[in-house]
Amino acid sequence: MVQKQSMANNNCIFCGIVEGNVKSFKVGENEHAFAFLDAFPVADGHTLVIPKKHAVNYSSTDDESLKAVSLLAKEMALKLQQRLQPAGLNYVVNEGAKAGQEVFHYHMHVVPKYETGLGFCYNVRKTNNRSIEANWELLTKEVD
C-alpha cells in the first residue's frame, strides 16, 4: 500500500484548511490552489487564495502553485464582481512580518472595495532612503 505524503506543514492553519481539518468557507478551488473567505474580513467578500502545497511566502512558492493561485484569484475576482458588485478590487500579498504577513503560508488577498470604503492605503512619508537612481543601479547591475 502506498501512503499519501502530506504536502502540509503540521502547524500551519492554512494547511489545515486545505486538508479539511480546519473549518473554512470555501468559495473556489483548482488542482493546486484553494480559495476561502477571510475569517477577519476588511470588506464583504474578502477572499484568500492559497496554494495547496505549503510555501512560507511568495518568493518560496513554486511556479506551478503561483500560476494556480493567480488563475484562481482571477476566477474569484470575476465571481466577486458579478455577485457583490464592488466598485473595485485590491490584490494584496504581504511577505514577511515587517510587511504585514501574519500567516506564514503564501496567500493572496482579493479584497472588494465599495463606494464607502477606503482603497489600499499606506502611510506616505518622506524617508532618507536611497535615490531612485541608486536603487535602479543596484537592481540592474550584473551580479558576480
Swiss-Prot record:
Which InterPro entries does UniProt cross-reference here?
Answer: HINT (IPR039384), Histidine_triad_CS (IPR019808), Histidine_triad_HIT (IPR001310), HIT-like (IPR011146), HIT-like_sf (IPR036265)
Question: Could you tell me which residue ranges the HIT domain spans?
Answer: 13-120
Source domain of life is Bacteria
Motif Histidine triad motif: which ranges?
Answer: 105-109
Q: Which GO terms describe its molecular function?
A: catalytic activity
Task: Please name the Gene3D superfamilies in this protein's record.
Answer: HIT-like (3.30.428.10)
What is one GO biological process annotated to this record? nucleotide metabolic process
Native organism:
Mycoplasma pneumoniae (strain ATCC 29342 / M129 / Subtype 1) (Mycoplasmoides pneumoniae)
What is the protein's given name?
Answer: Uncharacterized 16.1 kDa HIT-like protein
* Alphabetized PROSITE patterns for the sequence: HIT_1, HIT_2
